[in-house]
């Protein structure tokens, strides 16, 4: 039998398969990428055992647990664990603290299915603590540089061209602005933090010590940046990305209208998807009514409504440019002008996309290989 595991670094760097024996309610509050939830007890069973533990103590709770998970229920769960173990012979199982629940799963697999399967010592809690420390260590030991710039300048496009970029918005599944919600929703806060930590861990294991991030607010949608990282971002050097208003409008049109509509249609179908997309766009504008002011909001909402009607009728998106350009010029740009002035002392380079990409590659000492002739 393989040994029980305490090497959390190996688990995450090598994407070891893991099954989580916690109840679904625990799993959905926070888990690790790619892990499968195969609980010892469901939510109701866990609640009953927890109440029994508080009222009558550990032994009574253990006895109740064995009563609740018995017969056909027990056999079905053992079958699910055995299927996972056979499909993932290099995997592990865990519960919250690596204690009784994972030990019981381990024992039942052995006695009922003849399978020796190792567990993670310390369980979810220890692995979660390891990942929190991973992020703190990266912030303390690595070099970070931020990419800033007005809305629509293509900061995400810059990140996509860099080997050492960490895309925070991709981890949060959100574009980072008032209009940034995606059709597929955001991860739980803990899932966001765990995935980011694993990303940093893998990159550091590959030898990276310098990272490029987009200059973000503390909140990306409803995902909050880890505090040590956010605090560091208030001091990191900044590269400022520039582009023309026309190019920015086109980029916003593509991302927030064409691509977002396609996302909703892919998830919900043509008719329901377009309706959900239109509702999301209107909701995003309504959410900043107070900051826009009533008159400006009404003007932009009227243009947006006309644009959505035309898009629904014949697929044309040209009219969307009207509210997009007005929103940039009248709302977003003044905020970014203030931000740039307040961060001027940290800006070490400014330019358009290709110049910024080349500067950041030079800064990291990394250049893409030339294509073979």
UniProtKB/Swiss-Prot annotation:
Quaternary assembly: Monomer.
Alphabetical UniProt keywords: Selenium, Transferase
EC code: 2.9.1.3
Region forming the signal peptide: none
Coiled-coil stretches noted in the UniProt entry, renumbered to this chain: none
The keyword Transferase is assigned to this record: yes
Active site per UniProt: 95 (s-selanylcysteine intermediate)
Similarity section: Belongs to the SelU family.
Protein name per Swiss-Prot or TrEMBL: tRNA 2-selenouridine synthase
Database matches in PROSITE patterns: RHODANESE_3
Classification of source organism: Bacteria, Pseudomonadati, Pseudomonadota, Gammaproteobacteria, Pseudomonadales
NCBIfam families registered for this protein in UniProt: PRK11784.1-2, PRK11784.1-3, tRNA_sel_U_synt
Catalytic activity of the protein: 5-methylaminomethyl-2-thiouridine(34) in tRNA + selenophosphate + (2E)-geranyl diphosphate + H2O + H(+) = 5-methylaminomethyl-2-selenouridine(34) in tRNA + (2E)-thiogeraniol + phosphate + diphosphate; 5-methylaminomethyl-2-thiouridine(34) in tRNA + (2E)-geranyl diphosphate = 5-methylaminomethyl-S-(2E)-geranyl-thiouridine(34) in tRNA + diphosphate; 5-methylaminomethyl-S-(2E)-geranyl-thiouridine(34) in tRNA + selenophosphate + H(+) = 5-methylaminomethyl-2-(Se-phospho)selenouridine(34) in tRNA + (2E)-thiogeraniol; 5-methylaminomethyl-2-(Se-phospho)selenouridine(34) in tRNA + H2O = 5-methylaminomethyl-2-selenouridine(34) in tRNA + phosphate
């Amino acid at each position: 039998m393989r040994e029980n595991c305490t090497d959390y670094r190996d688990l995450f760097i090598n994407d070891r398969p893991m099954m989580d024996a916690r109840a679904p309610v625990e799993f959905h509050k926070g888990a690790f990428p790619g892990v499968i939830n195969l609980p010892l007890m469901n939510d109701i069973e866990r609640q009953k055992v927890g109440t029994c533990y508080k009222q009558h103590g550990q032994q009574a709770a253990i006895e109740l647990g064995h009563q609740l998970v018995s017969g056909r229920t027990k056999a079905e769960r053992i079958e699910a664990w055995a299927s996972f173990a056979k499909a993932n012979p290099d995997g592990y199982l865990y519960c919250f603290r690596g204690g009784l629940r994972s030990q019981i799963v381990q024992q039942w697999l052995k006695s009922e299915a003849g399978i020796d399967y190792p567990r993670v010592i310390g369980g979810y809690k220890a692995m979660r603590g390891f990942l929190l420390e991973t992020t703190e260590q990266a912030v303390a030991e690595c070099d970070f540089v931020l990419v800033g710039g007005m809305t629509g300048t293509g900061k995400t496009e810059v990140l996509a061209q860099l080997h050492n970029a960490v895309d925070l918005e991709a981890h949060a599944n959100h574009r980072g602005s008032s209009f940034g919600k995606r059709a597929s929703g955001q991860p739980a806060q803990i899932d966001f933090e765990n995935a980011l930590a694993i990303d940093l861990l893998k990159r550091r294991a590959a030898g990276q010590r310098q990272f490029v991030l987009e200059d973000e607010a503390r909140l990306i949608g409803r995902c909050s940046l880890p505090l040590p990282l956010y605090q560091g971002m208030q001091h990191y050097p900044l590269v400022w990305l520039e582009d023309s208003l026309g190019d920015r409008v086109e980029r916003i049109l593509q991302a927030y209208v064409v691509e977002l509509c396609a996302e909703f249609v892919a998830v919900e179908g043509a008719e329901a998807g377009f309706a959900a997309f239109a509702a999301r766009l209107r909701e995003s504008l309504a959410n900043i009514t107070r900051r826009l002011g009533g008159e400006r909001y009404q003007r932009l909402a009227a243009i947006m409504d006309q644009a959505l009607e035309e898009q629904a009728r014949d697929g044309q998106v040209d009219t969307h440019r009207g509210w997009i350009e007005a929103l940039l010029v009248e709302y977003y740009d003044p905020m970014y002008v203030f931000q740039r002035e307040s961060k001027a002392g940290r800006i070490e380079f400014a330019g358009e996309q290709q110049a910024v990409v080349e500067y950041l590659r030079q800064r990291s000492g990394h250049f893409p290989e030339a294509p073979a002739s």
